[in-house]
Amino acid sequence: MKRTYQPSVVRRKRTHGFLVRMRTKGGRAVIAARRAKGRTRLAV
């Protein structure tokens, strides 16, 4: 059986990247929450 996780930088950035997060209200909330928590990495 094929493993489910087949890493791809392109797909990773397109689905979880910073610009994608900034596009929606919910995504911006995620970034804001991570900033408030003091995360070094806000998005992938």
From Swiss-Prot:
Alphabetic keyword roster: Ribonucleoprotein, Ribosomal protein
Domain of life: Bacteria
One GO cellular component term noted in the UniProt record for this chain: ribosome
Coiled-coil stretches noted in the UniProt entry, renumbered to this chain: none
Entry-linked Gene3D superfamilies: 1.10.287.3980
Entry's Gene Ontology BP terms: translation
Family the entry assigns: Belongs to the bacterial ribosomal protein bL34 family.
Protein name per Swiss-Prot or TrEMBL: Large ribosomal subunit protein bL34
Organism: Dechloromonas aromatica (strain RCB)
